[in-house]
Each structure stands twice: as structure tokens, then as C-alpha cells.
């Protein structure tokens, strides 16, 4: 069985930047998990004494606080500043872009539509920048737009890790029903590249392994894309989750990895699959 990596996979610019920031601030705490990868979080904890604050009460006066890659709600950032904790912002620049767009367009009187998962930390942060939360709407499907009190002029942004084709469905539905629609494509380039590369490989592979955190939006999107081309597509966090039966009788095993998956985990998975051959 041949093992082939997707032409684009793994750590994106924003995650690489955040990891470097954390490593340079040994002994600090991240506000929320820095990235959606438990193994890498544990590496930072063990090697660099990086702690975790899940809420404001977990932050002590002496803590230096690293803001997670996904960003945090505006009011929580303001409270951290009011507490005068040293703050190191590791929010991905691709995430601050929709934050700024939402702030700017809502100030100009536009309704805000955000395509994404309302429970995802990135989206919780982005929507908090709206001037009036009653005029900001989070949707995952175009059907959810029906009946919403959206104004005649609307600005739309996307969670950075969503599928472009799904974003277009939201945009098309808005254009059909609203006089002025301002579209801001805030999907990250790395997301495009990883998704396209995974799709191309999945077309040829007879088994696909997608590596990444189970709570990682971009990893789940990759798995969904692979599954649409290759029925035997599996999402794992590390090599311990591999099952020998997946590879029985297979000729080509494709591998992709989410944006929060470090190369050392990818290599561990490859080594384990090699051993199973």
C-alpha cells in the first residue's frame, strides 16, 4: 500500500504564529485553548509551562495572558485589559479581519450576517464586535435566513474555515432578497488550499486519514470533503486511534491534516501506518 500526503496540509500561518508566540512567553496562560489540538496543547504545557484560563476567574493578577488564535469576545478582552494583565494577542490576523469588518459595517447601519457555527469561539468573538447584537445574525444554512429581520442593506462575512461553496449559497440567498449586499470573503487562503488538496487526493485514494482535533472546524470540514470522494475516510487525533482493518486490501492511503495539526503528529501517524502494512 502506498501512502501519500496531500499537497497542502497541516499548520497554517495563524497557528504557526500562535505557537511561536506561546513558546516565547513561557509560563503564561492562554485564554481559552490556543488551538484545537490537545496533543500540541500538552506539548506547550509540558515544555513551556503554558497554562490555561477557561474564564476570567481563572486569571490571576500576575498572569500574562495569551489570546487564543480564534480571538475572544470584545467584552472579555476589555475586562482583561481593565485588570491590567499583560496581554499577548495571538489572534490570527485572518480572524481579526472579520472582527473589524463587523465593527465597521454595523457602525454604518448595515445588518450583519455571519456564516458559521454560533458555538465556535471564532464566531463568538466576531459577532461581539457588532454595534447592535439584535442586528447581527449567525447562520449555517441558507434556510436559516428566512424570517430574520434583516435590513435592506446587509454585510456578510464567513467563518475563516468554512467551505466556499456553502458561503456562496448564503450570499446568493441574500442577493435575491435584499437591495444592497456587501460580501466580504473572509475564508482563509490556507483553508482553500488544504480543502482543494484533500479533495484531489481523496478522488484517487481508497482510504483517507484526516488528522486533527475533534473540535477543530477546519479538520471536520476536511473530513467531510474527503468523505464525499472516498467512503473510507477517517478522522483521528493521533496514531493511537488508527485501526488495522481500515487498510486491509487498500492500494493508496491518502493523508491530510487540519490547520492545528503539527508535523510531528502527522509523522507519527505515517510511521504507525507503515508498521501496519
From Swiss-Prot:
Alphabetical list of CDD domains matching this protein: lytB_ispH (cd13944)
Binding site for [4Fe-4S] cluster: 12, 92, 188
Cofactor remark: Binds 1 [4Fe-4S] cluster per subunit.
A Pfam family hit: LYTB
Keyword annotations of the record: 4Fe-4S, Iron, Iron-sulfur, Isoprene biosynthesis, Metal-binding, Oxidoreductase
InterPro entries reported in the protein's UniProt record: LytB/IspH
Active site: 122
Keyword Iron-sulfur attached: yes
Positions that bind isopentenyl diphosphate: 36, 70, 120, 216-218, 260
A GO term for molecular function: metal ion binding
Pathway participation: Isoprenoid biosynthesis; dimethylallyl diphosphate biosynthesis; dimethylallyl diphosphate from (2E)-4-hydroxy-3-methylbutenyl diphosphate: step 1/1; Isoprenoid biosynthesis; isopentenyl diphosphate biosynthesis via DXP pathway; isopentenyl diphosphate from 1-deoxy-D-xylulose 5-phosphate: step 6/6
Listed EC numbers: 1.17.7.4
Sites where the protein binds (2E)-4-hydroxy-3-methylbut-2-enyl diphosphate: 36, 70, 120, 160, 216-218, 260
GO terms (BP aspect): dimethylallyl diphosphate biosynthetic process; isopentenyl diphosphate biosynthetic process, methylerythritol 4-phosphate pathway; terpenoid biosynthetic process
Keyword ATP-binding on entry: no
UniProt similarity note: Belongs to the IspH family.
Protein role: Catalyzes the conversion of 1-hydroxy-2-methyl-2-(E)-butenyl 4-diphosphate (HMBPP) into a mixture of isopentenyl diphosphate (IPP) and dimethylallyl diphosphate (DMAPP). Acts in the terminal step of the DOXP/MEP pathway for isoprenoid precursor biosynthesis.
Protein name: 4-hydroxy-3-methylbut-2-enyl diphosphate reductase
Organism lineage: Bacteria, Pseudomonadati, Campylobacterota, Epsilonproteobacteria, Campylobacterales
